């Protein structure tokens, strides 16, 4: 079960823009991430590689946690992301992340957002 302090540290790393570093530091080796109903990606190394590839397509990433809840091993975070592609196109969207933690590390995460609502 994550402490509030641990969750706040995780959020701070993501908000700093170090998304791949957050995965390296706060996810279990066998962690999984799932976007909406897509098949999950599994394994911390896979998750880090995917995140680095996504970030490489961006010139700027803004991440802000609007609220977060901890209930035992379960965490919910409401995120606002603003992604600026290298072409200058800006995409902004709201996302809810549901996480399951093992101690102070995330082992399962699922993201919920409306892809049609990604504003360009």
Tell where the protein language model's regions lie, with residue ranges.
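Short, aromatic-enriched amphipathic alpha-helices that serve as compact interaction elements
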Residues: 1-18
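A solvent-exposed, acidic/Ser-Thr-rich amphipathic alpha-helical stretch
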Residues: 6, 20-73
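Hydrophobic beta-strand positions in extracellular immunoglobulin-like domains
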Residues: 81-83, 101
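Short, surface-exposed coil-to-beta transition loops
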Residues: 61-64, 78, 91-97
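Short, cysteine-centered beta-strand-loop-beta hairpins and adjacent loop/turn segments enriched
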Residues: 57, 83-92
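A short, polar/proline- and glycine-enriched secondary-structure boundary/capping micro-motif
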Residues: 45, 87-90, 118-120
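Short beta-strand edge/turn micro-motifs at domain boundaries
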Residues: 94-120
């Amino acid at each position: 079960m994550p402490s509030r302090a641990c969750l706040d540290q995780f959020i701070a790393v993501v908000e700093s823009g170090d998304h791949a570093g957050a995965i390296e530091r706060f996810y279990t080796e066998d962690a999984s991430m799932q976007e909406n109903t897509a098949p999950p990606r599994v394994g911390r190394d896979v998750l880090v590689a995917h995140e680095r590839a996504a970030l490489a397509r961006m010139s700027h990433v803004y991440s802000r946690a609007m609220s977060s809840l901890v209930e035992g091993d379960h965490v919910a975070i409401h995120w606002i992301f603003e992604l600026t592609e290298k072409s200058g196109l800006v995409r902004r969207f709201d996302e809810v992340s549901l996480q399951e933690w093992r101690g102070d590390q995330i082992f399962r995460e699922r993201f919920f957002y409306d892809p049609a609502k990604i504003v360009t």
